Amino acid sequence: MLKITIITLGNKMPDWVNSGVNEYAKRFHDGIQIKLIEIPLLRRNKSSDLARILEKESALIKDALPANARLIALDMLGKSFSSEELALKLTQLQQISSHLCFIIGGPEGLSNEILSLCDERWSLSKLTLPHPLVRIILLESLYRAWSIINNHPYHK
């Protein structure tokens, strides 16, 4: 069984975000387990020490990292994939690890410390995306790749 953990920073999401995440998570067959870990976003204001906030959030992310998982940071400077390339990449990753962990940062992204812990950096887009939407786009992209691998009609 392939486990996919998504660690994300954020506070209570709107219902449409939760609905989108749940919709794609339930589409995967029994051989894939999806787990979402939501770490509360620390409060920010105009006088916030953003470096200190990033450091604290990094510690929370590190505490949530699953053991023996392949760590993949979502980062604007990461590698991007077409749907077909992502399907091939997932096939390759399943031969390396039975547990993939995707990490989505907060408004300032991920710290260098977290990025250095990751095995890979992926980008979903060159655009800056709202972090709640990234959850849905990631799951849809993974589901589309899964459908390509399994010749499921979703991708057609």
UniProtKB/Swiss-Prot annotation:
Q: Which GO terms describe its cellular component?
A: cytoplasm
Spell out the protein name for this chain: Ribosomal RNA large subunit methyltransferase H
UniProt xrefs under CDD domains = RlmH-like
Task: Write down a Pfam family by its short name.
Answer: SPOUT_MTase
Q: What family name appears in the similarity comment?
A: Belongs to the RNA methyltransferase RlmH family.
Please state the protein's primary subcellular location.
Answer: cytoplasm
Catalysed reactions listed for this entry: pseudouridine(1915) in 23S rRNA + S-adenosyl-L-methionine = N(3)-methylpseudouridine(1915) in 23S rRNA + S-adenosyl-L-homocysteine + H(+)
Provide the species name: Legionella pneumophila (strain Corby)
Localization in the cell: Cytoplasm
Q: What does this protein do?
A: Specifically methylates the pseudouridine at position 1915 (m3Psi1915) in 23S rRNA.
Q: Which gene encodes it?
A: rlmH
- Could you say which residues bind S-adenosyl-L-methionine here? 74, 105, 124-129
Give the main EC class.
transferase
Q: Does the keyword Glycoprotein apply?
A: no
- Outline the subunit composition: Homodimer.
GO molecular-function terms, A-Z: rRNA (pseudouridine-N3-)-methyltransferase activity
Q: InterPro entries this protein is in?
A: Alpha/beta_knot_MTases (IPR029028), RlmH-like (IPR003742), tRNA_m1G_MTases_N (IPR029026)
Keywords in alphabetical order, please: Cytoplasm, Methyltransferase, rRNA processing, S-adenosyl-L-methionine, Transferase
What Enzyme Commission number does this protein have?
Answer: 2.1.1.177
